[in-house]
Amino acid sequence: DAAEPWQLGFQDAATPIMQGIIDLHH
């Protein structure tokens, strides 16, 4: 999969957020 720069930036920003949401639900 070839990721666009904005997709990489989005993933870098979203990962900690998603991890925090997962932590809240567990």
From Swiss-Prot:
UniProt keywords (A-Z) are: Copper, Electron transport, Membrane, Mitochondrion, Mitochondrion inner membrane, Respiratory chain, Translocase, Transmembrane, Transport
One GO MF term on file is: cytochrome-c oxidase activity
Query: So what does this thing catalyse?
Result: 4 Fe(II)-[cytochrome c] + O2 + 8 H(+)(in) = 4 Fe(III)-[cytochrome c] + 2 H2O + 4 H(+)(out)
What cellular component GO annotations does this protein have?
A: mitochondrial inner membrane
Q: Which Pfam families match?
A: COX2_TM
Q: State the free-text cofactor note.
A: Binds a dinuclear copper A center per subunit.
Q: What is its EC number?
A: 7.1.1.9
Alphabetical GO biological process terms: electron transport chain
Q: How does it sit in the membrane?
A: Multi-pass membrane protein
Q: Which domain of life is it from?
A: Eukaryota
Q: What is its main location?
A: mitochondrion
- SUPFAM superfamilies attached to this UniProt entry: Cytochrome c oxidase subunit II-like, transmembrane region
Q: Which cofactor does it need?
A: Cu cation
Location(s), subcellular: Mitochondrion inner membrane
The protein's job, in short, is: Component of the cytochrome c oxidase, the last enzyme in the mitochondrial electron transport chain which drives oxidative phosphorylation. The respiratory chain contains 3 multisubunit complexes succinate dehydrogenase (complex II, CII), ubiquinol-cytochrome c oxidoreductase (cytochrome b-c1 complex, complex III, CIII) and cytochrome c oxidase (complex IV, CIV), that cooperate to transfer electrons derived from NADH and succinate to molecular oxygen, creating an electrochemical gradient over the inner membrane that drives transmembrane transport and the ATP synthase.
Q: Which family does it belong to?
A: Belongs to the cytochrome c oxidase subunit 2 family.
Subunit field text = Component of the cytochrome c oxidase (complex IV, CIV), a multisubunit enzyme composed of a catalytic core of 3 subunits and several supernumerary subunits. The complex exists as a monomer or a dimer and forms supercomplexes (SCs) in the inner mitochondrial membrane with ubiquinol-cytochrome c oxidoreductase (cytochrome b-c1 complex, complex III, CIII).
Q: What is this protein called?
A: Cytochrome c oxidase subunit 2
